Design a protein with these regions (language model features):
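Non-catalytic C-terminal accessory region of glycerolipid acyltransferases
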Residues: 2-29, 45, 68, 73, ...
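Conserved H-X4-D acyltransferase segment
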Residues: 20, 24-78, 85
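General small-molecule cofactor/ligand-binding pocket signal
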Residues: 34-36, 97, 182
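Short, composition-biased local secondary-structure segments
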Residues: 52-61, 82, 103-117
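Short, surface-exposed acidic-centric catalytic microdomains
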Residues: 77-91, 101
Length: 213
């Protein structure tokens, strides 16, 4: 794939992931994460792998630091921006599988299926790669159906953040901010259930209250 990139893009690919991963580490050590769970839910890292997880694209940065130690397998688009993201998160310990839940999605989902069967946590940005923002696409439900697993969702809410004017309203946590990580109980792998769970996780994270306490 690298041969299809322009000289400027190749230079960016050589530099940006290194700088971005260092920046994420410098920011990440200042953040304070706290889990909240709806009834019947458990934080994903307290459940042995494998598992299928969904979250919104706007949560990628906060998630890149928080989930760095779990060898999480994540589906990332084959676009140039996707290549930048893939190389960045791989430097943080993630396993990037190229593809999407739309164009070229079938090979990506098959490789995600193999990762699940090999015992990995598998995650998909449910509204990626191009939106609409916070509207779930069928990719994560299809993956869960392939492997016969439920879908678990989470939302990472920085209490102080910059919100970009991008399609996903991407969130950049401000240094030293708190980040609430909300988890929902597992749902059946169908699109309405996944959308509803993602909506619940966002609402729970933004209120910051744990209904189990």
């Amino acid at each position: 794939m690298a041969s299809t990139y322009s000289l400027r893009q190749r230079i960016a690919l050589a530099i940006v992931p290194r700088l971005a991963s260092v920046a994420i580490c410098c920011l990440g050590v200042t953040l304070r994460y706290r889990d909240v769970c709806e009834p019947g839910a458990t934080p994903g890292y307290d459940i042995p792998p494998p598992g299928v997880y969904a979250f919104w694209h706007r949560c990628l940065l906060a998630g890149a630091w928080h989930f760095r130690d779990y060898k999480l397998t994540i589906l990332i688009s084959r676009s140039f921006d996707g290549e930048l993201i893939a190389r960045t998160v791989e430097r943080l310990g993630f396993i990037a599988i190229r593809g999407s839940s739309s164009r070229d999605g079938a090979p990506g989902l098959r490789n995600m299926q193999r990762a699940y069967l090999a015992g990995h946590y598998c995650a998909i940005t449910a509204d990626g790669p191009r939106g609409p923002s916070m509207v779930a696409k069928p990719g994560v439900a299809h993956l869960a159906q392939l492997v016969g697993a439920p879908v678990r969702t989470c939302y990472l809410h920085p209490h102080r953040a910059w919100e970009l004017r991008s399609w996903d309203r991407f969130l950049i946590p401000k240094p030293f901010s708190r980040v609430t990580v909300a988890w929902t109980s597992p749902v059946t792998p169908d699109l309405p259930s996944v959308q509803a769970a993602l909506d619940r996780s966002m609402a729970l994270a933004q209120t910051g209250n744990n209904p189990q306490k």
